[in-house]
């Protein structure tokens, strides 16, 4: 039997890309879901087993209120930005993430929740050999462009590992690279895929690509990311991180080629090297999660097709 069936599950960041995917999945698992939103659109789902509440998780009292009667926490509330936003909001990316996360960890442990699921970030890894393993997280400083957010994510990882030793709460942690899918931030602050999809949808030609197009990234479809987190919570809720993804690397130029192929046009590419771009190469070693028995259901193209279909239906 699923560990989620008939359990009271709290999902923070429920209006975001990961949160909405998790809400849908938990309802299918027959859980009783309390979805926490802040100031974005509320969850699009309506269900007898779904309660949507508004809360500011930077306020400890709000965290105390939402944790009541909860068995499992899936914590996705986060302040996230793409390449340009990471340069513009370096302080906010630390403070607006660490305070709500520590608050939720604190109230979860103090209320003896059974499981706590957390998505960490590959920005915590140093710029070392690739593909990078989980054991290498502290083998050097984070990439200079990720210094603030990288150390913040490392801190949260250590807090989780410490809290794992305190009481019965069990922690599941996964580390993806570039998450994409329906309900992403399709705006100025979004990550690469939403911005590229918007350009392709508008028929941009020549097609503007930030940087040289040679940056190497691994992408993971959001439903696969949520599935991996739930899998780790069931199989090894030890607080130790698991890298997750397809294990397939893609350059930004290859990504744009795939997106424009789906839109059935062939624009010329214009590489704007004056625009912000981040680390030139980042690959995760996914051997550990593979050995645990998990693998993703979507390759990049099938995930992009689902994402583009959703965007065209909802823009």
What are these regions (language model features)?
Residues 128-131, 154, 159-234, 247-249, ...:
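NAD(P)-dependent short-chain dehydrogenase/reductase
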Residues 93-101, 117, 152-153:
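Short alpha-helix in the Rossmann-fold core of NAD(P)-dependent oxidoreductases
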Residues 12, 36, 73-79, 116-122, ...:
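SDR active-site strand-loop-helix element
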Residues 54-96, 110:
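NAD(P)H-binding glycine-rich loop region in Rossmannoid oxidoreductase-like domains
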Residues 202-315:
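C-terminal substrate-binding subdomain of Rossmann-fold SDR/epimerase-dehydratase oxidoreductases
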Residues 31-40:
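Conserved glycine-rich Rossmann-like NAD(P)H-binding loop of the short-chain dehydrogenase/reductase
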Residues 75, 102-146, 172:
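Conserved Rossmann-fold NAD(P)-dependent oxidoreductase catalytic core, especially the SDR/UDP-sugar
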Residues 7-29:
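N-terminal Rossmann NAD(P)H-binding glycine-rich loop of SDR-like oxidoreductase domains
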């Amino acid at each position: 039997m699923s560990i989620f069936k008939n359990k009271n599950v709290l999902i923070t960041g429920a209006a975001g890309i990961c949160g909405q995917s998790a809400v849908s999945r938990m309802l299918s698992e027959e859980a009783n879901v309390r979805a926490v939103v802040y100031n974005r659109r509320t969850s699009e789902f309506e269900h007898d087993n779904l309660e949507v509440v508004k809360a500011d998780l930077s306020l400890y009292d709000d965290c105390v209120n939402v944790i009541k009667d909860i068995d499992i926490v899936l914590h996705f509330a986060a302040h996230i930005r793409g390449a340009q936003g990471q340069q513009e909001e370096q302080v906010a990316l630390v403070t607006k993430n660490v305070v709500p996360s520590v608050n939720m960890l604190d109230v979860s442990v103090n209320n003896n929740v059974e499981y706590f699921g957390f998505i960490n970030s590959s920005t915590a890894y140093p710029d070392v050999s690739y593909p990078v393993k989980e054991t290498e997280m502290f083998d050097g400083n984070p990439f200079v462009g990720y210094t603030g957010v990288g150390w913040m994510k490392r801190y949260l990882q250590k807090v989780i590992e410490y809290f794992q030793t305190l009481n019965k709460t069990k922690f599941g942690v996964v580390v993806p690279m570039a998450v994409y899918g329906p309900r992403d931030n399709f705006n100025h602050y979004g990550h690469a895929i939403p911005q590229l999809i918007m350009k392709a949808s508008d028929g941009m030609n020549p097609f503007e690509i930030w940087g040289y197009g040679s940056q190497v990234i691994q992408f993971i479809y959001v439903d696969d990311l949520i599935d991996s987190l739930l899998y780790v919570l069931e199989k090894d809720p030890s607080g130790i991180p698991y890298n997750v993804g397809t294990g397939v690397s893609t350059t930004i130029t290859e990504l744009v080629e795939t997106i424009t192929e789906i839109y059935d046009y062939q624009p010329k590419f214009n590489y704007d090297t004056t625009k912000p771009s981040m680390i030139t190469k980042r690959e995760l070693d996914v051997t550990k999660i593979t050995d645990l028995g998990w693998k993703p259901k979507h390759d990049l193209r099938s995930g992009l097709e689902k994402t583009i279909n959703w965007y065209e239906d909802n823009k």
